[in-house]
UniProtKB/Swiss-Prot annotation:
Catalytic reaction list: tRNA(n+1) + phosphate = tRNA(n) + a ribonucleoside 5'-diphosphate
Name of the protein in question: Ribonuclease PH
Keyword Transferase in record: yes
Keywords: Nucleotidyltransferase, RNA-binding, rRNA processing, Transferase, tRNA processing, tRNA-binding
Highest taxon above the source species: Bacteria
UniProt organism field: Photobacterium profundum (strain SS9)
Pfam families: RNase_PH, RNase_PH_C
Annotated binding of phosphate, by residue: R86, G124, T125, R126
């Protein structure tokens, strides 16, 4: 039995609130249960130096957590003068995932930066960030079309993510903190709306997992992400 009473395949209640802030071209508050992340997409009419003159755009991301997003206060990374390894890993994952959804040549020499700020963490912050960031990215692109800086959308399709794992010997989907902290295996999966894999990050925290357990986790991820993509599209239509 899971702490929340959910079935093994059930994701947490998910809410995607668009236009959450006033100034960004795209902004979303995404909630996976008690995990809450603000995702803002900002457009710049330039690209990194190494892309200048190449006729393509760029999508990047930054990630951070408020000091009291967790049970105990974490020191702000800015106060130590550098980002931690976990932060850098997560923001690179978010950026790679978003770029898989975009035709960078069709974007032209423009850059979109998506900032993902965790205001409350209860497991799955990176997967929630990717899911919310994708919606914010679509809104930013639509804003560019309205302003005339893009003629058509470079979005190839939706991208979403979910965590899966082995908890008490059973494969489960969308782990909350109590499950994540006690899981034998923890895995994050990013997929396209067609069910193609973008990234799989999996680690056995205790006992090694079998090939059969891997397939079970991936099957849960595929079904969970399909449900999440449906929620993304519903949010964009609202």
């Amino acid at each position: 039995m899971r702490p929340s009473g959910r079935s093994t395949s059930q994701v947490r209640p998910i809410t995607i609130t668009r236009n959450f802030t006033a100034h960004a071209e795209g902004s979303v508050l995404v909630e996976f249960g008690d995990t809450k992340v603000i995702c803002t997409a900002s457009v710049e009419e330039n690209v990194p130096r190494w892309l200048k003159g190449k006729g393509q755009g760029w999508v990047t991301a930054e990630y951070g957590m408020l000091p009291r997003a967790t049970h105990t206060r974490n020191r702000r990374e800015a106060s130590s003068g550098k980002q931690g390894g976990r932060t850098m890993e997560i923001q690179r994952l978010i950026a790679r995932s978003l770029r898989a959804a975009v035709d960078l040549e069709a974007l032209g020499e423009q850059m979109i930066t998506v900032d993902c700020d965790v205001i409350q963490a209860d497991g799955g912050t990176r997967t929630a960030s990717i899911t919310g960031a994708m919606v914010a990215l679509v809104d930013a692109v639509n804003s560019m079309i309205e302003k005339g800086t893009l003629k058509k959308s470079p979005i190839k399709g939706m991208v979403a993510a979910v965590s899966v794992g082995i908890y008490k010997g059973e494969a489960i989907c969308d782990l909350e903190y109590l499950e994540d902290s006690a899981a034998e295996t923890d895995m994050n999966v990013v997929m396209t709306e067609e069910g193609k894999m973008i990234e799989i990050q999996g680690t056995a925290e205790g006992e090694a997992f079998s090939h059969e357990e891997l397939l079970a986790m991936l099957a849960l991820a595929k079904d969970g992400i399909a449900d999440i993509v449906t929620m993304q599209k519903q949010a964009l239509e609202s």
